[in-house]
């Protein structure tokens, strides 16, 4: 047994990258996740509309951060702002008592607002929860979970695609063939793209049928978002594969990119509750934007115009991943061009 | 026009993998690179096909070069037919000519009966033959085969060499590396490598004739200039002086490569 243990120790120590991951990553993950793990809502972006827009803000609880106060805007305008995700709470003033409109797709903010309104009622103030009136947890989680499943399945599977070629010696064959690096990248993700597209349709359909998650909006932005998100998720896997020395390293790296997406993409913990540095990590994750698109379309009925920002960011992330992977492939497939003869 | 390397040097960090190595591969001929493990054969192949950058010298390579890596380069989870079809597609070969060429290659290599078998289900010899067929399929001007016969049984080696000779007969320039010195006789020229340096080069006859000193055979060892060959010992005398109790013998290529390595060691 001693010989076996010694052999294993030697192998583990020799794989520097895995060793570094084993030692450094737990600390990093604990710190990042520790600062992310909070259900506390510190601020709720708020809009106040209607004739009393200038007077009402002073009466609102401190948690309600009034970003917009527009005396000329109507309830319809307020609902539009909520649908577009510009604010999460709107106070509509008018002839009668003010009405608070809450975005039910932002579960923790909506619940926090309801609690505050119930604990310290403002006389005559009523509230309405839009998009998810029952404040149903599964309705909020399922759209993001669909993306999370794709991250795990897609990124993990594609993370082995290139490293497997290297281990079996076929990468050299690809290198001497007249392929451009982008041909290899696109060829690698194409079959997984098709399968993952079917996966996402199945997951969202089951979510809709089994968990009663509504589909209130047009499917077009959802399709655009899903396709861009799949491209990024699968591209990350291929990129991981191209920098990994073996399949074990590839899987570890893929898991290391998937885990933060669970905690930092806003699916479980609200982004606004996270420490600023950790929140910015969340802003770099594709699932953050797919979650915004999926929730926006399915719960709030948001349209293409409302979701331009997350869609554009998904496309931008796709472009970055594509560029990095192609650059990496270029150095792997055509090393002779990189290292100049003297 | 001949393809090959001229005074090529390849370094990996502080280690020199190839030190000023030259080799010419003529169309219609087979050039053999022979050497022990670590001699630099694979680096030479990878350099010739453009997978390694060079630190000096010149590479002469045609636009279309076929390459079979040491691992055979066969995709394990594709069938024989799918492997060949993939290569045809990669090189943009037209469907009908490609299909005809694939059928010819399947017939010549004897893989026709295994066309639906997965790469991982092939024997070592079949894998190597498929690897060579894949390298040949695009009709390259230069074919580089890295140890295609290593680990094969004698029958498979013969079949593979027959296929290589047939391919050379089509006018292709072929470079083959091997650890077996007896295979060097199958080539038109030979380059012996050791530690990334060229020990000897030319036709087999030229290389043998160029051996310095004389070779003797004895029943016992005679120090550092002797080595076991079968049941007897070979003794190299650099100055061709007779060795007491030993008989002078004619060297073969294996002897000459060993002598060249000893001479190089002595110079170092």
Give the label of every model feature segment.
Chain B
Residues 49:
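Helix-to-loop junction immediately C-terminal to a conserved catalytic motif
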């Amino acid at each position: 047994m001693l010989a076996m243990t010694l052999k294993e120790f030697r192998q583990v120590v020799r794989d520097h990258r895995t060793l570094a991951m084993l030692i450094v990553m737990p600390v990093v993950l604990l710190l990042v996740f520790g600062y992310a793990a909070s259900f506390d809502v510190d601020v709720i972006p708020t809009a106040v509309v209607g004739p009393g827009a200038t007077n009402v803000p002073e009466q609102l609880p401190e948690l309600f951060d009034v970003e917009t106060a527009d005396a000329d805007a109507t309830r319809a305008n307020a609902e539009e702002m909520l649908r577009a995700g510009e604010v999460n709470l709107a106070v509509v003033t008018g002839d009668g008592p003010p009405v608070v409109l809450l975005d039910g797709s932002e579960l923790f903010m909506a619940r926090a607002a309801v609690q505050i309104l119930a604990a310290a009622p403002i006389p005559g103030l009523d509230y309405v929860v839009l998009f998810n009136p029952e404040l149903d947890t599964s309705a909020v989680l399922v759209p993001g979970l669909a993306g999370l499943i794709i991250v795990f399945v897609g990124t993990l599977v594609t993370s082995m695609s290139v490293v497997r070629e290297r281990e079996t010696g076929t990468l050299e064959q690809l290198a001497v063939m007249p392929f451009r690096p982008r041909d290899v990248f696109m060829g690698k993700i194409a079959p997984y793209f098709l399968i993952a597209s079917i996966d996402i349709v199945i997951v969202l359909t089951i979510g809709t049928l089994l968990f009663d998650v509504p589909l209130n909006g047009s499917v077009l932005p959802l399709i655009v978002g899903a396709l861009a998100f799949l491209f990024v998720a699968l591209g990350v896997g291929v990129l991981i594969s191209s920098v990994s020395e073996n399949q074990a390293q590839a899987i570890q790296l893929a898991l290391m990119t998937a885990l933060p997406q669970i905690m930092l993409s806003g699916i479980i913990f609200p982004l606004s509750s996270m420490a600023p540095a950790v929140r910015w990590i969340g802003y770099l994750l594709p699932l953050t934007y797919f979650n915004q698109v999926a929730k926006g379309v399915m719960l709030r009925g948001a349209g293409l115009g409302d979701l331009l920002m997350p869609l554009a960011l998904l496309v931008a992330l796709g472009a970055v991943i594509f560029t990095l992977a192609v650059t990496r492939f270029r150095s792997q497939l055509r090393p002779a061009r990189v290292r100049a003869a003297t | 026009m001949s393809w090959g390397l001229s005074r090529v040097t390849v370094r990996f960090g502080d280690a020199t993998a190839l030190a000023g190595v030259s080799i010419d591969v003529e169309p219609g001929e087979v050039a053999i690179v022979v050497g022990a493990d670590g001699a630099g054969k694979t680096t030479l192949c990878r350099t010739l096909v453009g997978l390694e950058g060079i630190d000096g010298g010149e590479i002469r390579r045609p636009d279309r070069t076929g390459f079979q890596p040491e691992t055979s380069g066969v995709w394990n989870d594709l069938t024989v037919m799918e492997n060949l079809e993939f290569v045809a597609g990669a090189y943009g070969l037209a469907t009908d000519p490609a299909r005809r060429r694939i059928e010819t290659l399947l017939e010549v290599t004897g893989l026709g009966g295994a066309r639906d078998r997965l790469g991982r289900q092939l024997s070592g010899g079949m894998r190597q033959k498929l690897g060579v067929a894949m390298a040949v399929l695009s009709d390259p001007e230069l074919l580089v085969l890295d140890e295609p016969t290593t680990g094969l049984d004698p029958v498979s080696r013969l079949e593979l060499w027959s296929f290589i000779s047939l391919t050379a007969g089509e006018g292709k320039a072929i470079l083959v590396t091997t650890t077996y010195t007896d295979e060097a006789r199958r080539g038109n020229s030979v380059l012996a490598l050791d530690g990334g340096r060229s020990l000897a080069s030319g036709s087999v006859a030229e290389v043998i004739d160029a051996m310095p000193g004389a070779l003797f055979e004895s029943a016992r060892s005679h120090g550092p200039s002797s080595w076991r060959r079968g049941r007897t010992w070979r003794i190299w005398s650099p100055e061709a002086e007779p060795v007491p109790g030993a008989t002078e013998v004619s060297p073969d290529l294996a002897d000459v490569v060993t002598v060249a390595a000893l001479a190089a060691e002595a110079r170092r």
